[in-house]
Amino acid sequence: EAPPKEPSPNQPKLDRLVAILKEQIGGDAVEDAYINEMDRHTPTVVVNRERWHDAAVLLRDHPELKLHYLRSLSGVDYETHMEVVYHLFNLQNKQTYCFKVRTDREQAEVPSVADVWPAANWNEREAWDLLGIRFTGHPNLKRIMLPDDWVGHPLRKDYVPVDPEV
């Protein structure tokens, strides 16, 4: 029998983060929370899509969190649903957190956080362009890589290219 696994050194940070989100945003703000051991024990939280923008403002402005730096934003097509993944970083204590927002695949829509972290602007446009995830409230949601007349979103798993050479 394997010995019990020791808790992650980041578990207290995750617990505090979840408590802050639930206290400040609401009990329904957090859909799931776990330590991603494969990613250097990164505290990871799945945030309710309807609460995401409010949560983003809190994450940036809360004096304990100070997540001022958006390290990355990417979209993922899981076939059953779409997900937007955000890696946020506290520049003072060098702590990284991961946040995920799930959305329906057929009407993929997530609130924009370009007003919270300006770096999200182009990343949201890229996720729109390639995966078709619409970011509501984005100041300029249009294609960023593909021509304006491109049909579809080529990184979706159900994408069928019009031209077989593509």
Regions flagged by a language model, labelled:
Residues 1-166:
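Terminal low-complexity/charged segments
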